[in-house]
Amino acid sequence: KIKVADPGLFMVGVVSNDETKIPVYDAAKKRIIVNNLNDGGDKEYVGIVKTGDEFYVKLPEKIDKVIILTGVIKTEFTSMANQKSYYELGKGTITYHPFSVAKRSKVQFDITSIGKKHEKVGVYIEKNVNGTWKKVGYSTTVKPDKYDSTVLYGLEAGKYRLALKTPKDQIINVEYTRDKSKKKAAYKKSKAIHLKSDIDSIYTSTEKAARWYKVSVSSTKKRKAVTLSKDSVGGGFKFCVYQKGKRLKTVKVTKNDKVKTVKLPKKKGAYYVKVTKLTSKTTGAYYLGTYTY
């Protein structure tokens, strides 16, 4: 018998020496809540519980050793700390979750649904500007299923809050990660950063100036290509490739996880990549890489 002491998301799991079936029943011992705890999974989420709820774990008659693990996870949270995980039980209304950014950073939220309900969740960011909350970048919706739905922003120092609109009775897990991102950018072609390996950088909502990168082709026997991609909420980036002042190619990247490739001419020389935001509200990361083929 398991009796719940605190309200929240109830979790139960087992560690066993064999593969004997171990089900979980309701308080009346009639309805099976979890068919088998001992099927190789680390844990099972039974659902939202309140103080005093009861469950029964049915063990086999012959048993060597079984360890039963139980816990209740809070389904409400307010402020967030870096590299921490939180759970929320949706109310169908917007909830706000404050966090601080000390230095220019790449900020990421991985959102996963727990349980059977996997409806869309509304997401956006606000910044505290002189005591007033103002939206940063674009709003979006994610539909978290088995896998994480990632939302990424490029943010300058300040006080922020994550706004979530989770459907009523839907349980979500939110993992918050913040990584400092030093501002390494060249704003003139003559000072372009030499692209020798893969790089990534961010644009915050207030950063608008174009940035320059240089790619050198030293052999005509093999060709070189530049890969371009991004991770942002809405908006996107434009990449223009130049040689000797002439624009060779323009590529717009508006979808995440969509890598585009520009094959450079089979000709020695220096090529330049100019990066700009497609919209003033774009905030997030862009990625540049090169390879020889």
Located regions from the model:
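Non-catalytic extracellular/lumenal accessory regions of secreted precursors
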Residues: 1-7, 17, 37-40, 68-106, ...
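A short beta-strand element within beta-rich, extracytoplasmic domains
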Residues: 9-16, 106-114, 222-231
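Noncatalytic modules at the cell exterior or secretory-pathway interfaces
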Residues: 47-62, 152-167, 222, 263-278
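Exposed aromatic-hydrophobic patches
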Residues: 43-48, 97-98, 147-153, 258-265
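Edge beta-strands of jelly-roll/beta-sandwich modules across compartments, strongly enriched
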Residues: 20, 58-73, 97, 119-121, ...
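Short, surface-exposed beta-strand/strand-loop-strand elements in extracellular ectodomains
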Residues: 19-30, 119-131, 235-247
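Beta-strand-connecting loops/turns
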Residues: 7-8, 52, 92, 104, ...
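Solvent-exposed serine/threonine-rich low-complexity stretches and specific carbohydrate-binding patches
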Residues: 31-40, 122, 135-145, 248-256
